[in-house]
């Protein structure tokens, strides 16, 4: 009986400590949108993140599989080089377990489109991110 009470208490405490996965993803978008990249990279991005941006490497500046926080930061940092006034605003999210899919409005100078972003959240951090962007519209809006 005591063991069940301890397990129940642990489950309650775990729920209070861990944010809902959609809240974690929303917080990431909020931090990114406000420009608080220090908190975004420091608190939301897992050290062992894998970010997959489909596309042919060399043709799109973000294309590839980027493993680890340093590679994630290096590649995310390219965004202002190529797109002025880049913003992503979630329109809807669905989740199952630790997985979240966000339908996102993507805007920049010369760009107004929709993206899809897939996340796997671990310990209130992005562990996996896969980006499904309108690469043609984004490419056409790039500073070249």
Regions found by a protein language model. Name each.
Residues 2-144:
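C-terminal and inter-domain tail/linker signature
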């Amino acid at each position: 009986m005591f063991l069940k009470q301890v397990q129940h208490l642990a489950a309650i405490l775990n729920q209070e400590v861990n944010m809902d996965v959609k809240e974690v993803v929303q917080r990431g978008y909020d931090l990114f949108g406000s420009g608080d990249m220090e908190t975004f990279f420091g608190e939301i991005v897992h050290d062992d993140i894998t970010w997959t941006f489909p596309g042919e490497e060399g043709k799109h500046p973000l294309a590839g599989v980027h493993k680890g926080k340093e590679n994630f930061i290096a590649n995310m940092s390219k965004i202002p080089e190529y797109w002025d006034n880049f913003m992503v605003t979630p329109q809807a999210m669905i989740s199952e377990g630790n997985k979240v899919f966000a339908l996102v409005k993507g805007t920049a100078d010369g760009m107004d489109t929709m993206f899809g972003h897939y996340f796997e959240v671990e310990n209130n951090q992005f562990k996996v991110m896969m980006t499904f962007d309108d690469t043609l519209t984004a490419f056409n809006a790039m500073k070249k």
